[in-house]
Amino acid sequence: HVRSDMLRNVRGGFSLRWMKVLLDNDIEIRAQIVLCPGVNDGDVLESTLAGLLEQYPTLESIAIVPLGLSRFNTEERMRVHTQLEAAQVIETVAKWQARYVRAIGRQPIHLADEFYLVAQEAVPETSHYGEFPMLEDGVGLVRSFLDAFAGTGPDLMGKQSGFFASVDVPSPTDYVRVINPAADTGLRSSASVPVSLRTRKPTVNKPVAVVTGSYGATVMRNALTAQNFDDVVVLEVTNQ
């Protein structure tokens, strides 16, 4: 019923049957659950994870991500998670991660970083994310950034020479291959053309400024404080 309601399709509840066909033919599936507070979290999330374990144990991964909203939203019941709700999601997911390990010997469930930020809880340690296979889903971005910033982990996003990177496309209609067509987050072509800006050395009365969103601002401030970068200003931009 919930799936049919969310898809606005009376037959939507049966849509997952096609996953079994794909899995039976050795097609790798990386599933994603977009969690909407008051709609498909709580008992519904418990039922979803139980059903996936019982019927689709060979799923490569299951990413649980939060609902994204802007001021253009027209659905009155759609809203972001509260701190308490985010903490409850973390608790539920941790419980099911352990159950999956006991049942199938591996842990395919991954929780997006935003839940930890909203709940004001620390993100998991590096070992929790393995090789960080789901950065494009917002899973492990904070931990990978903190590790790279502190110099304790690899730069998983890759290094580009120059301040910007660009690619040349002969025609606007030409196809440009991306690494992950489901969630490309930037220009990562190995044949990119570097474009450098003139370096300006900051003066004492003109500190370096970092412009980022609300969640990024929290992470950035903590990272800067930990590394004693007291001459860097974080400018928070609220998403609307």
Region roles according to the model:
Residues V39, L67-S70, H110-L117, G213-T218:
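Gly/Ser/Thr-rich loops at beta-strand to alpha-helix junctions
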